[in-house]
């Protein structure tokens, strides 16, 4: 399972294993570790529901309906792609319109070529990687169009996937019409203004037989909602504490179901953290902490994960991850504890497509801290 099976490009494992691996190679390292430890697993098994009291209902072909009462649950459902329906693009529904992840699966796993003349809408990492993959497979990628005035992907992917293959990146552009009834025949692109609405007169028709959509990822939290887990409205994932535990005791979350990551190494790091916390919970080692410190982002910082920390349970420090709202150049990233600035670091560049991190120490929280705020400042 998992998305790594279809990510046959390299770039994985630089942080974790200090070497460059493909997605399947990276996954195989952990599969080997799980087998060596004789960890029980169930394949081809669909979880239908999780209750607040940690009762799991699942189904598979061998055992039929399965009921499991767990003492701790770690949510690792990942995320799904935003579909064409969420974009409200006018036009018919011809063949040839795919999400970038679906096209990635068709090309890398199934061996099918979705099309020959390709336009990609959205510059998320999957869209950038598929621009390169389709070019390598012999297709002609006409352009990558991005609604925002900046790319949503990693700088590394923009250089390696677009610049190296001379694929144009059209910023502040979007698809305003889709042409073709049976098969896609072309799309109309238009420039958008600061209000993100098409500029009249800027439309241009581009003939193509395939449109790939890379327009955002949504954490897959339907099961979480069934367990009455509180979700963060910005990340779309559960609100968690320093142990990655949700508001439901014994239910933890990590990876893309928690918030969308750019590097799998960070997902693995988070997963190990959630695993340790779940094991500690099962053994009854989690202290009942009265004091909870709230973490928030403002003035350029969109969110923080975790959203709260309990100083008594956090150890010496905890890694806080977050994203900025816009690209910033030569600005300062600051951290305030109850209004007092404890950190003020100059960053040459900060971009929404690249996750930032900050190590928050228990010492910095002192004995009475109530709130930690992260923000971007001019000086």
For the regions a language model picked out, list residue spans one by one.
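Beta1-alpha1 glycine-rich phosphate/pyrophosphate-binding loop at the start
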Residues: 1-29, 105-108, 114-160, 344
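FAD-binding core/adjacent interface of flavoenzyme oxidoreductases
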Residues: 27-117, 191-201, 212, 239-240
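A Rossmann-like FAD-binding core segment of flavoenzymes
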Residues: 34-58, 68, 135-222, 316-349
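FAD-site-proximal beta/loop scaffold in flavoenzymes
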Residues: 75, 97-107, 210-261
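Residue-level detector of alpha-helix initiation sites
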Residues: 79-81, 124-126, 218, 258
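A conserved FAD-binding loop/helix module that cradles the flavin
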Residues: 254-304
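Surface beta-strand/loop "capping" patches
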Residues: 287-328
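Short, aromatic- and glycine-rich surface loops/edge beta-strands on solvent-exposed regions
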Residues: 320, 333-335, 360-379
């Amino acid at each position: 399972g998992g998305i790594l099976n279809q990510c046959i490009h390299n770039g994985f494992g630089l942080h974790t294993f200090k070497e460059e691996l493909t997605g399947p190679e990276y996954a195989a390292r952990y599969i080997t570790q799980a087998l060596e430890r004789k960890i029980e697993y169930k394949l081809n098994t669909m979880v239908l529901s999780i209750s607040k009291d940690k009762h799991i209902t699942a189904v598979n072909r061998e055992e039929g309906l399965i009921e499991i009462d767990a003492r701790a649950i770690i949510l690792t459902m990942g995320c799904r792609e935003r579909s064409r329906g969420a974009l409200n693009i006018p036009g018919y529904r011809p063949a040839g319109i795919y999400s970038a992840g679906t096209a990635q699966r068709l090309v890398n796993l199934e061996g099918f070529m979705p099309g020959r003349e390709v336009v990609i809408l959205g510059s998320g990492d999957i869209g950038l990687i598929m621009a390169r993959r389709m070019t390598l497979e012999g297709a002609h990628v006409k352009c990558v169009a991005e609604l925002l005035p900046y790319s949503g992907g990693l700088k590394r992917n923009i250089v390696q996937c677009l610049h190296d293959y001379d694929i144009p990146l059209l910023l502040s552009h979007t698809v305003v019409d889709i042409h073709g009834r049976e098969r896609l025949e072309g799309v109309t692109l238009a420039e958008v203004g600061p209000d993100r609405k098409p500029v009249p007169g800027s439309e241009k028709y581009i003939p193509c037989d395939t449109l790939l959509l890379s327009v955002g990822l949504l954490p897959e939290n339907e099961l979480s909602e069934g367990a009455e887990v509180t979700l963060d409205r910005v990340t779309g994932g559960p609100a968690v504490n320093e142990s990655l535990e949700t508001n439901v005791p014994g239910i933890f979350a990590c990876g893309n179901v928690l918030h969308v990551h750019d590097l799998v190494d960070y997902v693995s790091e988070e997963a190990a953290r959630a695993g340790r916390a779940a094991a500690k919970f099962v053994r009854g080692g989690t202290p009942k902490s009265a004091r909870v410190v709230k973490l928030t982002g403002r003035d350029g910082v969109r969110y923080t994960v975790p959203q709260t920390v309990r100083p008594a349970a956090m150890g010496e420090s905890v890694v806080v991850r977050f994203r900025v709202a816009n690209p910033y150049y030569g600005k300062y990233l600051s951290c305030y504890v109850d209004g007092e600035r404890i950190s003020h670091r100059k960053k040459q560049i900060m971009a929404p497509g690249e996750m930032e991190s900050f190590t928050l120490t228990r010492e910095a929280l002192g004995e009475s801290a109530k709130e930690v705020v992260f923000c971007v400042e001019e000086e």
